[in-house]
């Protein structure tokens, strides 16, 4: 997750 691209951030963020 840390090494993964900033996709999780956009997804979570967006969801939140």
UniProtKB/Swiss-Prot annotation:
Annotated catalysed reactions: (R)-amygdalin + H2O = (R)-prunasin + D-glucose
GO molecular function, one term: amygdalin beta-glucosidase activity
EC number: 3.2.1.117
Signal peptide: none
Domain of life: Eukaryota
Keyword set includes Transmembrane: no
Entry PTM: Glycosylated.
Keywords in alphabetical order: Glycoprotein, Glycosidase, Hydrolase
Quaternary organization: Monomer.
Protein name, as recorded: Amygdalin beta-glucosidase 1
Lineage, broadest ranks: Eukaryota, Viridiplantae, Streptophyta, Embryophyta, Tracheophyta
């Amino acid at each position: 997750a840390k090494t993964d691209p900033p996709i999780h951030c956009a997804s979570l963020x967006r969801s939140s």
